[in-house]
């Protein structure tokens, strides 16, 4: 998840009070060949859409995100994150909290080529840490892999995670 972090469309490191909100469309016009067969492995991965590291008080809401060939919304070591009203159709993972705490993900609709929401506890921050105090609710997830997943790149752990009212297609 940490590879090519700085090449993401929206990058934030050690930021406070970050908001990416509004009735906006982000279409990354992927490198995927539209003539290809859905579900084929993507050979060329482009940049992540939104990538944040060690940020506090993050709000991401009311966005449409399309054609991302890497992680759509990835955040590592962040605290107090609110993600809501996201509609996405992407080729890899949708939302990936990594070693983050006090996270709320709600009222989102996603169609992903890989995992819908994947909780990670990787070594991307060069230390062991955990995902903690996460609440996910009122989301619709259509995925070619795991709609909800715990454990990719996990070295730390998970604590106090509540998932409710999820519709998996």
Region spans (language model):
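Extracellular/periplasmic carbohydrate-active domains that bind, remodel
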Residues: 1-169
């Amino acid at each position: 998840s940490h590879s090519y972090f700085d090449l993401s469309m929206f990058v934030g490191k050690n930021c406070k009070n970050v908001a990416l909100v509004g009735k906006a469309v982000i279409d990354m016009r992927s490198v995927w060949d539209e003539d290809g067969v859905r579900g084929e492995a993507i050979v060329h991965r482009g940049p992540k859409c939104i990538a944040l590291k060690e940020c506090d008080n993050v709000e991401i809401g009311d966005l449409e995100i399309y054609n991302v060939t890497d992680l759509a919304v990835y955040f590592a070591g962040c605290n107090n994150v609110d993600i809501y009203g996201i509609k996405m159709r992407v080729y890899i993972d949708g939302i990936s909290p990594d070693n983050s705490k006090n996270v709320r993900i709600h009222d989102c609709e996603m169609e992903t080529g890989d995992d819908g929401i994947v909780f990670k506890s990787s070594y991307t921050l060069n230390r062991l840490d955990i995902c903690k105090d996460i609440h996910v609710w009122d989301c619709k997830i259509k995925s070619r892999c795991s709609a909800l997943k715990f454990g990719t790149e996990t070295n730390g752990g998970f604590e106090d995670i509540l998932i409710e009212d999820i519709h998996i297609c």
